[in-house]
Design a protein with these regions (language model features):
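Extended recognition patches within non-cytosolic domains
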Residues: 78-111, 128-129, 236-254
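Short surface loop/edge beta-strand patches of beta-sandwich-type extracellular domains
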Residues: 98-115, 140, 169-175
Length: 254
């Protein structure tokens, strides 16, 4: 088909092959880190049943590879379309997994109320990809002690941020359409619970939750490694306070 050759020094792109006219490519360099970000797209035509892709190292035109030449490669996360997956560093053997989940022991991180959780979330979708994409939840807890922070959907709002803990289900419907936000939940000493998203705070209701056993775990980004309730997005600056933050503190936004 065709190739897009990128000069890593000048960032010049040269298209070759029979499909060169159908290839578009772009490249930029992050001067702070030295990484070069490259992207190439080919326009398919009728009759092409399969199109593969690969990354190759090539010496400069007219030159040759010499001892000591090397290049670092990092594959991107593919998080849109029917081929959603996340590639991971795996040594010399290629590997992929359906769901990137961070699992954290709850021991010494969270036990009882009051507490507040805040994090930055970027969801890479506009329509919920499953029943309830998780920002985080818990596993291995005792009956009635589950904690959930994620996104839900209804007839009127698709993708609203919400929390669910001990029968207290709090939503911020107004921010259902946001792709990036600071979101979280707060549980006070008197069990009053609310959800927060980018400066909006839901009304409060009482939870029956009081504590969680120390053998439980916190799961960030999904529910199972099989992809159940996978977020299909990014979570960063995940923070837990062992106190109820004020409305002003909970009202962070990005």
């Amino acid at each position: 088909l065709g190739d897009a050759y990128i000069d890593t020094q000048t960032l010049e792109i040269n298209m070759t092959g029979g499909a060169a006219s159908r290839i578009t490519a772009r490249v930029r360099k992050d001067e702070a880190t030295g990484w070069i970000f490259a992207e190439a797209t080919i326009q398919a035509i009728d009759g092409e049943l399969k199109i593969g892709s690969q990354i190759q190292y090539s010496p400069k035109q007219g030159g040759a590879t010499v001892s000591g030449d090397y290049i670092y490669l990092a594959t991107p996360q593919v998080e849109n379309g029917p081929c959603v997956s996340s590639f991971i560093i795996s040594g010399t053997t290629a590997a992929t997994r359906a769901s990137d989940i961070v699992t954290v022991p709850i021991k010494n991180n969270l036990y009882n109320l009051p507490f507040t959780v805040l994090c930055e979330v970027h969801k890479n979708w506009y329509k919920t990809p499953n029943a309830a994409p998780r920002v985080f939840d818990t596993g291995g807890h005792q009956t009635g002690a589950a904690i959930i922070l994620g996104f839900g959907s209804s007839a009127d709002y698709d993708g609203f941020p919400y929390c669910d803990i001990g029968g207290a289900n709090r939503r911020v419907n107004e921010n259902a359409s946001l792709e990036k936000m600071v979101m979280g939940m707060r549980v006070k000493s008197d069990q009053s619970t609310c959800s927060a998203s980018n400066g909006r705070i839901s009304s409060e209701t009482k939870t029956t939750w009081s504590c969680i056993q120390n053998t439980a775990i916190i799961r960030i980004g999904g529910q199972t490694t099989a992809g159940l309730r996978h977020l299909f997005g990014h979570v960063r600056n995940f923070r837990i306070w062992h106190k109820a933050l004020t409305d002003a503190q909970v009202g962070e936004s990005i």
